[in-house]
Swiss-Prot record:
Pfam families recorded: KH_2, Ribosomal_S3_C
UniProt source species: Borreliella burgdorferi (strain ATCC 35210 / DSM 4680 / CIP 102532 / B31)
Function recorded in the entry: Binds the lower part of the 30S subunit head. Binds mRNA in the 70S ribosome, positioning it for translation.
Subunit structure: Part of the 30S ribosomal subunit. Forms a tight complex with proteins S10 and S14.
Gene name tied to this protein: rpsC
Family membership: Belongs to the universal ribosomal protein uS3 family.
Protein name per Swiss-Prot or TrEMBL: Small ribosomal subunit protein uS3
CDD domains: KH-II_30S_S3
Gene3D superfamilies, alphabetized: 3.30.300.20, Ribosomal protein S3, C-terminal domain (3.30.1140.32)
InterPro entries, A to Z: KH_dom, KH_dom-like_a/b, KH_dom_type_2, KH_sf_prok-type, Ribosomal_S3_C_sf, Ribosomal_uS3_bac-typ, Ribosomal_uS3_C, Ribosomal_uS3_CS
Record-linked PROSITE patterns: KH_TYPE_2 (PS50823), RIBOSOMAL_S3 (PS00548)
Length: 293
């Protein structure tokens, strides 16, 4: 069976950025990577009551002893807590875990209807609350499309409705071009913990194509990606070519009809003038003969 690559990792440095931003010696790489895993796990464990409100966790390191954590959420107030109590507790917890200075920032999601992770979290939360998965999926689909999404695909899998055999259910609307690298595809995955087992939710959200962006290649060279020609432009160019061909054919026809450097109409007009001139001359000659006689 064909498998799908993660849409985010496929587009890193094309129209997506890294979620962990740091660079260290290769000897420290595994330790730093493990710290990133611990940071994300501890934050989600601490905020398990509002885990469905977390879209992403970004980690930035400018030096080995300082870590900046950015929590992306559509509800900053619930993450911050009363007078910043949650942030303070999270900072103390992470400092104890990794023994480094922690700085926590909050980034708000302005349009949660166009965030694939938030959509997946919302569906998982409603499925946990025993809502009808068909209604939930169709409602999420219509809401996102009305808010401006160009395409959306949602897939849910597991023991749906408490069935004995696990199966999957999928809804889709619009375009979701997963093989187009310039397409801005947002991807989200969440799990619903039900009495029948875990139900997985996957969301692919197409926000449009990103054109004219400068990116770094694997060799570090800057490449200016030129916009691809749209279908409308191709049709216009095709019509223009047809018009040019028709004009060329008409011109060729006029050239074939020319006689002594004149067009057919001009030749006909000249013949008429010659005929009328000769007719008037014959008439004048006959009048002179009558007068002389």
């Amino acid at each position: 069976m064909g498998q799908k690559v993660h849409p985010y990792s496929l587009r890193v440095k094309i129209n997506k950025d890294w979620k962990s931003k740091w660079y260290f010696d290769k000897k420290l790489y595994s330790a730093i990577l493990h710290e990133d895993f611990l940071i994300r796990r501890e934050i989600m464990k601490f905020l398990k009551g509002i885990k469905f409100d977390i879209s992403d966790i970004e980690i930035i390191r400018n030096n080995p002893q300082k870590v900046t954590v950015v929590i992306v959420t559509p509800r900053p107030g619930s993450v911050i807590g009363l007078k910043g109590s949650n942030l303070e507790k999270i900072g103390q917890l992470l400092t104890k875990k990794i023994s480094k200075k922690i700085s926590i920032k909050i980034k708000e999601v302005k349009r949660p209807e166009l965030d694939a992770q938030i959509i997946a979290n919302g569906i998982a939360k409603q499925v946990e609350n025993r809502a009808s998965y068909r209604k939930v999926l169709k409602s999420s689909l219509s809401t996102s499309m009305l808010k401006g999404a160009q395409g959306l695909k949602i897939k849910i899998a597991g023991r749906l409705g408490g069935a004995e055999i696990a199966r999957s259910f999928e809804v889709k609307e619009g375009r979701v071009p997963l093989h187009t690298l310039r397409a801005n595809i947002d991807y989200g995955f969440s799990e619903a913990q039900t009495t029948y087992g875990i139900i997985g939710v996957k969301v692919w959200l197409f926000k449009g194509e990103v054109l004219g962006r400068q990116t770094n290649s694997d060799a570090g060279q800057v490449i200016n990606k030129k916009p691809f020609r749209e279908r409308g432009d191709a049709v216009k160019n095709f019509d223009k070519t047809l018009n040019n061909r028709e004009k060329a054919n008409e011109k060729q026809t006029r050239l074939l009809d020319k006689k002594d450097g004149l067009s057919k109409d001009e030749v006909d007009l000249l013949n008429k003038k010659k005929f009328s001139a000769s007719f008037s001359k014959e008439r004048d000659d006959s009048n002179e003969q009558d007068i002389g006689g």
